[in-house]
Design a protein with these regions (language model features):
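Phosphodiester-processing cores and adjacent nucleic acid-binding clamps
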Residues: 1-229
Length: 229
């Protein structure tokens, strides 16, 4: 079975990525990949180098983003000015300040234009940290594929009660996660997928992946396997 990784970080994911775009492409060729995606944290700055290296190697480049998201399911996501600990003004989502992760992929030229619009808006609208709002994501959703994201995503944190690892998933948490998944499905249709990451040494990932199997059966949302590398 051919595998195409749809979640990857180069050194352009500052502080969280390893290897240049050229090195990632070289490794993909070693593994006999025919295509691969790059999904940097909050930016698309690696895409030019990635595309150049991929095309030279006969590899299909897939352009993506791991976005920092505010209330992405709220189209009218209000923002407010806050004073941070240093006394500087910050513009943050009014409904909570925690940013969840979301994997976004461009499936065509229109999608790539919209991906860059989303990134640009995330820097223009929010102070210090680029943040994708519900309005930006939903108004630029044409040509995009949305994966539910890593264990820091809205769906995963709803399911697992935050960043910790519960001994088991309680029914109220599953019902809340089901509602989140259905709302994403309602917004993005067949372009929304549950993202499974096979990090079997991490209890959190195992709990998340098992629950996603159940969510997939209950909702009809397809699953996709990625390696968050």
């Amino acid at each position: 079975v051919e595998f195409v990784n749809l979640h990857g970080h180069t050194t352009h994911s500052y502080g969280d990525g390893f290897g240049t775009p050229v090195q990632h492409v070289a490794r993909a060729v070693e593994l006999s990949y025919t295509a691969m995606a790059v999904t940097e944290h909050g930016n698309t700055s690696s895409h030019f180098q990635f595309e150049k290296a991929a095309l030279a190697a006969g590899l299909k480049p897939i352009f993506g983003l791991e976005a920092y998201c505010g209330s992405v399911l709220e189209e009218n996501d209000e923002r407010r000015l806050f004073y941070n600990a240093e006394g500087k003004v910050e513009l943050r989502p009014a409904k909570g300040q925690y940013k969840n992760h979301l994997t976004i992929l461009a499936k065509d030229a229109d999608g790539y234009r919209n991906l860059n619009r989303i990134v640009t808006q995330s820097y223009l609208d929010y102070y210090y940290h680029p943040t994708v709002s519900g309005h930006s994501l939903q108004s630029n959703r044409e040509g995009l594929v949305i994966l539910s994201g890593c264990s820091g995503s809205l769906l995963a944190c709803t399911l697992l009660g935050g960043k910790g690892t519960p001994e088991h998933i309680r029914e109220p948490a599953y019902k809340s996660a089901l509602d989140v998944a259905l709302r994403f499905q309602d917004t993005f249709g067949q372009d929304y997928y549950l993202e499974v990451q096979p990090f079997y040494e991490l209890e959190r990932s195992c709990a998340m992946n098992h629950a996603y199997e159940v969510l997939s059966r209950d909702t009809g949302i397809s699953m996709v396997v990625t390696h968050d590398v």
